[in-house]
Amino acid sequence: MRSLAPAMSRSTTHIARAIAWILASAGVWVAAAGDPLYAAAGDTLAKVKTRGTLRCGVSEGIAGFSRKDPSGRWSGLDADFCRAVAAAALGDGNKVTFVPLRASARFPALRGGTIDVLARNTTWTLAREAGLQVRFAGVLFYDGQGFMVPAKSRVKSLAKLKGATVCVEKGTTTEEILEHHSKATSLGIKTLVLDSLLEAAKAFFASRCKAMSGDAATLATVRVDAPGGAQAFVILPERISKEPLAPVVRAQDEDWLTLVRWVLNVLVAAEELGITSQNARKRMADPSLERGLHATEEVSRALGTDGDWPLRVVESVGNYGEMFERNLGQGSPFKLERGLNAQWTQGGLMYSPPFR
């Protein structure tokens, strides 16, 4: 996966405009938190324990992130994160009910209490956190908005898409970002908005659009299943946004947010420390290990779970690196490079706050 660094400077010009737009709309959005869709604040963990299963919102089928195979098993980075949370909360990573959602339905499902946590390629933004009364638990995957074109088109850069029609998925940040970028660069791009990622991909492959836009990693997974094979399509090098994809929970349940956040931190810290699904039991018994990874009874009680929850998390799905390689990296059909999702010691952005 290519570096997103160039996108940072290109997207800076949109920041002031975006903030102004967010603030102008904030009164309406905050008021919306009181509507019937907004579930009453409560102890999500207690409800999960009473139910005996974690209800996790995922995509309707984005390979590498969350997709159900013919046997009915869900796989992908997001699906594995759901299992990690279930392992911490319920003691068993298999106690998950996966709830497939279109992008436009994900926040109503979370706010209305249909799901306990959302792990569905969701970008962490100020507008969403402040306006929708949700909380993001940390970045699970760093991405950026990109473009895919047919290889035979010989389009090599975004500038060559001037005046083109581009397919996008409804209910995502993609359409808005593309509109801003098109105006700022005078590209005159027109969007064809489809109800789901699958429909957007079908329209693109049917030549209804000259390009398809979305998170670059998602485009890479879509390309693998493309008619004519992956080699028939090219992902352009430009990125026009930063897309930190993060698990989401409802606001006003800080205890649940803390548990979900530190499940993610355990996965990241375990990779840095060389703790894997195979050696976790031995390594986590090492008294020299950072104190928090031993999960003292005092800390575990504060989180509302059992003392060995970090061990259960890693034994259930492996560390972050294992999850990445299995679902998106060299052990997958997509062969994505770690890029920004590498450990901080390897030039990436992934690291955990201290556990002490």
List the model feature ranges, each with a label:
Residues 2-22:
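Bacterial N-terminal signal peptides that target proteins for export
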Residues 17-36:
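Bacterial N-terminal signal peptides
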Residues 37-121, 296, 303-305, 310, ...:
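Extracytoplasmic small-molecule ligand-binding "clamshell" domains
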Residues 38, 80-83, 87-89, 152-155, ...:
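Extended ligand-binding regions for polar small-molecule ligands
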Residues 44, 81-82, 105-110, 197-203, ...:
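Short, hydrophobic alpha-helical packing/hinge segments within bilobed ligand-binding/sensory domains
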Residues 49-53, 86-91, 111-115, 152, ...:
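Sec-exported extracytoplasmic/periplasmic mature domains
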Residues 55-64, 74-89, 123, 143-199:
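Bilobed "Venus flytrap"/periplasmic-binding protein-like clamshell domains
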Residues 83, 87, 91, 95-160, ...:
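Acidic, polar ligand-binding/catalytic clefts
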